[in-house]
């Protein structure tokens, strides 16, 4: 689960980190009033979406004119912002963040992730702030400095000083950086973060450190113990099909291909996508119905797959272990009848009651293509998607 910038900054403020005074606004009038409450003669207005690249897409504006703030808010509120990190539809803008403007002397980067290799929280800092850190990692990896947090001892001030020295900070800035580092590390564990970024962490013209932006990703598996964070979830930023799938405990990820995939088990689902690719097809989704699939969930999975207009054929690949193949077959038949499937459906069943499942499908009278193996299923569904 991701947070908006204004939500991230509210958490930063709770831990004593330096952030700009700002207000998240729902209307153009609120945005104008927010500028008045902040004071000064220069403000920054930002569209609030769960995607980077807002500035290049026109979603960030610096202005000293309150009427320009009104015009910006009226233009974006209720519309979708398309950036390099979104699909062609973009993400809806429901709030505008109005902040005081900060005079910048230099831009740094500070972030943290859970590193699967070390099984530790790893902090990363760089002098290359304000740009995509992935680009820095690829082109100049020596400019990224790391600190690994030991879960037994927690974050240590010496780690902050080591990073600060590599960033070229002076003694005053070093103290500020240590406070920021310790606060972020504590926050990361307290709230079960999976990702944290301040890009840029700026040095102001007065020589102070300031958190100019904030990006936070939460470990979805830990939300049960984070009610405050869970309440910050903005469902409008989620893919509609993914959100619908989550209601039925289906693991669904939308992709850009034309072969719909319904599989039980994440590993088998990834293998199915690979073999579809191997035979020249492009998966339209990842969908794992899980080991405890019911007829209702299978039917719902079918509806979700077919709600994607790009899907030209569907591959159902089921290995019956916990779940019975005959039950899956009944779910497929029910969904095909209920939804009125107009695209070819290729089914491969193996495992518990596989023969019975194939028999149920054969007697259904529906136009369902039975596959003898996974390779056969992939070949058949790719041909079907191409209209052959």
Swiss-Prot record:
GO terms for cellular component: cytosol; succinate-CoA ligase complex. Pathway: Carbohydrate metabolism; tricarboxylic acid cycle; succinate from succinyl-CoA (ligase route): step 1/1. Its EC number is 6.2.1.5. It comes from the Bacteria. The keyword Nucleotide-binding applies. Succinyl-CoA synthetase functions in the citric acid cycle (TCA), coupling the hydrolysis of succinyl-CoA to the synthesis of either ATP or GTP and thus represents the only step of substrate-level phosphorylation in the TCA. The beta subunit provides nucleotide specificity of the enzyme and binds the substrate succinate, while the binding sites for coenzyme A and phosphate are found in the alpha subunit. This is Succinate--CoA ligase [ADP-forming] subunit beta. It comes from Shewanella sp. (strain MR-4). The gene is sucC.
